[in-house]
Regions:
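Extracellular attachment/recognition segments
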Residues: 1-84, 92-277
Length: 277
């Protein structure tokens, strides 16, 4: 039995298969990066969304389709050739481990934990849907770190989501998809370390208790906003979390239009976890 993790970059509206060495007992899917773009043009915004559709065609394979939406009310839509997600599939393979939970869900999902006492309890972001009633500028897009709300041996997930033009208009639709990693084992065979607000052009050190050889970052939330507290058209939004060989986490949360307006690096950040195994 072992933890296996695979990552792939998948364009919006495309699918890819993740084939593992052994039989998959349980799994979850998340992201370490996403980019949503109109292409060469900038436009108003009505909807910004990302979702991951998953299927398991056989005992060793997970198929993931990336769906994304960046659109206004005038027919301008996402450029799928310039829009993608880096998808992370975390799977426990081989013999089942009843001290472990890997699962995806949303605000309505009640997760059954392996125990009322856990050594690992971490959430990840797997998608979001933000929409105005009609076209507006974008000033800020925010999906706060997914919260784990625990009640004995069950848990639910929640977050706060915002999309605003800073002129009194806010998203009328705000939903999310997420995942949960939970273990009650004192030696699960991996560690999970969380980051806290990795701002643009900064980094954070992550220290593990064991000398793991593999490390994979996953996003748990983000905030991106234009400078000067202003709203503008949008050309693209690009958010990612990365991890290097010297225990350092880097994050970028960016957006821009075609008039030279960019995100505020002082106020834009990404949150996540790093799995060492």
């Amino acid at each position: 039995m072992a933890l296996e993790i695979q990552t792939k970059q998948i364009n919006v509206n495309a699918s890819s298969e993740f084939t593992f060495t052994n039989t998959i007992q349980e799994f979850l899917i998340g992201i370490s990066r996403f980019r949503l773009s109109y292409g060469d043009s900038d436009h108003w915004v009505k909807t910004v969304s990302l979702s991951l559709n998953q299927q398991q065609p056989d005992s060793n394979t997970i198929s993931v389709q990336v769906l994304g939406n960046l659109s206004d009310g005038s027919g301008n839509t996402i450029d799928t050739s310039d829009s993608f997600a880096i998808v992370v599939v975390v799977a426990w393979t081989g013999t089942a481990d009843h001290t472990l939970l890997l699962a995806n869900g949303d605000a309505n999902t009640v997760f059954t934990l392996p125990s009322s006492s856990t050594t690992i309890l971490s959430s990840i972001l797997a998608g979001f849907d933000l929409a105005y009633d009609t076209d507006h500028y974008i000033a800020q897009i925010n999906v706060s770190t997914i919260n784990v709300n625990r009640n004995g041996n069950t848990a639910t997930l929640s977050t706060t989501e915002n999309m605003t033009d800073r002129d009194g208009n806010w998203a009328s639709t705000a939903t999310f998809n997420a995942g949960l990693i939970a273990s009650s084992s004192s030696s699960p065979g991996f560690e999970v370390k969380a980051t806290s607000n990795v701002y643009n052009n900064t980094n954070q050190s992550v220290t593990f208790n064991s000398a793991w050889t593999n490390f994979v970052p996953m996003m748990t939330g983000f905030n991106v906003e234009y400078s000067n507290n202003e709203g503008h058209w949008l050309k693209s939004i690009d958010v990612y979390l990365s991890y290097d060989a010297v225990n350092t986490v880097y994050g970028v949360s960016s957006m821009c239009d075609n008039d030279g307006n960019w995100q505020s690096n002082e106020n834009s950040f990404v949150n996540g976890i790093v799995i060492g195994y």
